[in-house]
Amino acid sequence: MKTKKQGSNWTAYYDPDTGRYFAEIMYTSREGREQYDYEITQDVYSRLGTFSDDVDNERLIKTAKMTYSFENTMYGTLGPERTVWDEEAREAMRACEEKQTVKERKNKQKQTAKERNNKK
């Protein structure tokens, strides 16, 4: 199973070690930044990326349990600047993201080494 899916403003992760699914929606502009993290279900994860419009993917993600929000815009915050709804889920999502990043780096290094060997 694919462990990472991505759209314009969203990224979803599957952690095979824990069997959990997470998604992040992030908006950035000159006005500021907004970030929302969710713990999603396998059903939501499997449907992500099947829509022709990313807005539909974001709507699907928003049906899940929100675990974290961050809003910092030039218009002021819409509540507490940072709100952690579920600390354990947020930490699990960050660990999953880190695993994905390490995995992607290793794959990139392998690909680079393979390309160097092919040039010799």
Put a short name on every predicted segment.
Residues 1-30, 67-75:
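Long, compositionally biased stretches
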